[in-house]
Swiss-Prot record:
Protein's name in the database: DNA-directed RNA polymerase subunit alpha
Record note on domains: The N-terminal domain is essential for RNAP assembly and basal transcription, whereas the C-terminal domain is involved in interaction with transcriptional regulators and with upstream promoter elements.
CDD domains the UniProt entry points to: RNAP_alpha_NTD
GO terms for MF: DNA binding; DNA-directed RNA polymerase activity; protein dimerization activity
Region called Alpha N-terminal domain (alpha-NTD), residue ranges: 1-234
Subunit structure: Homodimer. The RNAP catalytic core consists of 2 alpha, 1 beta, 1 beta' and 1 omega subunit. When a sigma factor is associated with the core the holoenzyme is formed, which can initiate transcription.
EC number(s) per entry: 2.7.7.6
Length: 328
């Protein structure tokens, strides 16, 4: 129970009921009165609109120029085939854009398991039917583009793609979210003598590309990250103090003596008024070889010493020398 009337009850995860691999029910309690709807509605909206995932975005079918057509030997029209392709549940690792291929011939259903893909791709629903071939000589060949995204993106919003795409490349409305259904319910909860508390029950179904528990965890993380700005609200009114980055790397401001060159090389550089490492790196090999008494052996020594410090001759330094050196 609370130690003070101003303290809020901290909810705990009471139960996770795994109805199936894609269907789960999560129960959270106790919540202060009203917080069940506050949190439940926020999580529901995020789960429906903001979960990242992979979806079919473009399809090329051999012999098909546009979606308002049909293909000989295929029972479904092209619009229905595209609609079925939207139902593919795909998981892609380490890539944001992949091309899958499908080639099938002979009578029978064409299913997701007939799609050819590499090791970075996993099709979660291999039994998903894409179309049916109705003739022994019928065949279908297609290339399916799968991209990573978030939420729902209609094909009509990708206008730049429509203008650039070749004839025969069909755009598909992309539903990236792996969440298929989400509902929440707020029930009464009790802690000791308090009976006005909430219990939040979230029921969630996904397409299998993401486990229900992980989906809720990600949604809660997104919500928490968005609310972080309000936690630091007082700091927003204060001007942000930007750390001034040094204009030049500190090593460039050090004297040439720090390179510990031989006496001959050091004296030649001083005679040319090269006092700082920043002065030296801006000189080219040709310029240094014109220096009296500085030969190829000394030049090689200078290049090796600079290279050991990640520097080289012929570098360009904007705004050199800095004010601190110019004043000396």
């Amino acid at each position: 129970m609370q130690g003070s009337v101003t303290e809020f009850l901290k909810p705990r995860l009471v139960d996770i009921e795994q109805i199936s691999s894609t269907h789960a029910k999560v129960i959270l309690e106790p919540l202060e009165r009203g917080f069940g709807h506050t949190l439940g509605n926020a999580l529901r909206r995020i789960l429906l609109s903001s979960m990242p995932g992979c979806a079919v975005t473009e399809v090329e079918i051999d012999g098909v120029l546009h979606e308002y057509s049909s293909k000989e030997g295929v029972q479904e029209d092209i619009l229905e085939v595209l609609l079925n392709l939207k139902g593919l549940a795909v998981k892609v690792q380490n890539k944001d854009d992949v091309i899958l291929t499908l080639n099938k011939s002979g009578i029978g259903p064409v299913v997701a398991a007939d799609i050819t893909y590499d090791g970075d791709v996993e099709i979660v629903n291999p039994d998903h039917v894409i179309c049916h071939l109705t003739d022994e000589n019928a065949s279908i060949s297609m290339r399916i583009r799968v991209q990573r995204g978030r939420g729902y993106v209609p094909a009509s919003s990708r206008t730049h793609t429509q203008e650039e795409r070749p004839i025969g490349r069909l755009l598909v409305d992309a539903c990236y979210s792996p969440v298929e259904r989400i509902a929440y319910n707020v029930e009464a909860a009790r802690v000791e003598q308090r009976t006005d508390l909430d219990k939040l029950v979230i029921e969630l179904e996904t397409n299998g590309a993401l486990e229900p528990e992980e989906a809720i965890r990600r949604a809660a993380t997104i919500l928490a990250e968005q609310l972080d700005a309000f936690v630091d609200l007082r700091d927003v009114r204060q001007p942000e103090i930007k750390e001034e980055k040094p204009e030049f790397x500190p090593i460039l401001l050090r004297p040439v003596d720090d390179l510990e060159l031989t006496v001959r090389s050091a004296n030649c550089l001083k005679a040319e008024t090269i006092h700082y490492i920043g002065d030296l790196v801006q000189r080219t090999e040709v310029e240094l070889l014109k220096t009296p008494n500085l030969g190829k052996k000394s030049l090689t020594e200078i290049k090796d010493v600079l290279a050991s410090r990640g520097l080289s001759l012929g570098m360009r330094l904007e705004n050199w020398p800095p004010a601190s050196i110019a004043e000396d």
